[in-house]
Each structure stands twice: as C-alpha cells, then as structure tokens.
C-alpha cells in the first residue's frame, strides 16, 4: 500500500474481476474480440450519418450522438481492463481514479438523458406526426443535445465533488476492475451515511427517473400504435418493443449498482462488467441496425470504399 507522509492515499489497488487466471484469460480474449469487432462499428455509424446528406432527421442526429457517447464510454474502462489482465499489480493513481469516475458519470449520465430525448422524439413522430417538424426542429434538437451534455456534466461534477471532500487514509484496495463511486466511498475513513444518501439521490434517483420516464413514453407509444390501423404498425411495435428490452438491459444493472450503494452483493462485478463494457458497445448497434435507412446508407458507403480500393489496386 502506498501512502504519503500525511497519511493520504495516493493510489488504489484494483483487485480485478476475478483471481482465477483461467477465467481472466477467457474474459480477456472474449472482451478483446468483442471490442475489436463492435467498436469500429460505432465509428462506422458515426461516419455514415455524417457523410450521408439524406440522413438529416432528428433521429439520425441522436443515433450518431449515441454511437459517439458509447464509443467514448467504452474507452474509459475496457482498454485499461485489458491491460490489467496482463499485469500482476493493478494500480491506478488517485487522480486517475477521479478522472475515470468523472468520465464514467459524465458520459453515462448524458447517455441516459439522450435515451429520454430519443423516446420523446419517437413519441412526437408516432403520436403527434403533424407537430413533428415544429417541435423537433433543428434548433430544438441542438438545444436538447446541449441540455443533455450539460446534464451529464452537472451529474458527474456532483459525484466528483463528493469524492474529493472525503479523507482517504488507508486501506486502498478497490474490489473491482475500475474506479466507481460505490467502491471508492467504502475506503474513506469517515462516516459515509450522509454521503451515500447523496449518492443515491444523485445517481440512483436520476437513473430511476430516466428509467420510469422511458418506460412510460414507450408504453404510451405502444398503446397508440395498437389502436392505429396503419401499414407501419407492426414495424413500429417491433421497434418500440426492442427499445423497451434495451432499456431494461441498460437501466437494470445501473439501478442495481446505484440505488443500493450501502452493501456489496456477489453479482456486483458481473453486473458492472455488463454495464460498463459489454452493453455500451452493443447499444448503438442494436438501435441503429434496425433502421433501414442507415443500413442502406452504410451499404452504399462500404460499396464505394470497396470500388475505390479495387480501382486503386488496378491502377497500381
């Protein structure tokens, strides 16, 4: 344990996902393959939406931002986790821990708010189609984007300020593979009851409200679609049902992690792995690859790239 002369902890030791070498190797290989396949897919989504002038509807602005948020989010935990699998001593500095914690909550909070905005966009498009062009105009869309980024920033700053005010005088072992509020506050050498209540209010309540708001929005949309007699009824119901499943998969672990910070549970690490590494990589792919316009544009983009490569090879 490394502690400075003033008894302030300057680094944390990450105990990792598991102590079993065989399981570590298996998880390392799976996450590396998963990361190398799906992460480029997120950047392809961003590039496709940015390069196609036909994808200008608010939905595509939100899908592009979702891919950017999740690609950025995956950079916070996964690369370091992969490096730590190969290291005997898994150490992160105090400043590095605070930085990781800040970006986790900045991007995670922003993404939760973005999903709420996307649900509102679908509600307007399906239930109030005549008002879509006036309500979801470019100015309103960019204002919503600014608001969700600011919301994520404020949420994260509150978390960081609460952590920075805590004294850490040892021990310095975090029973996880990354730095997060739930594990860090357990190491503070002071009474944590009030701080944990504030954490529940900031993270847990925000997560729960986003979750309930999303479920309510899609419940209203599904009820409206069921009563409608349009050609796209089945497609709209399928899309909404898929998004509800995604919301359950995303917010279930988040609620599990942040609504009950007072006790450690056996499933904590696996839930954290799913929440911080696996789902952020899958999320934009699931949302976007159900959109026919994006898939068509992506195929055209890849076809042009292949043609250019073949032409370059022939000329040289």
From Swiss-Prot:
One of its GO terms (cellular component) is plasma membrane. The keyword Membrane applies. Its main location: membrane. It comes from the Eukaryota. It is a multi-pass membrane protein. Keywords: Disulfide bond, G-protein coupled receptor, Membrane, Olfaction, Receptor, Sensory transduction, Transducer, Transmembrane, Transmembrane helix. This is Olfactory receptor 4N4C.
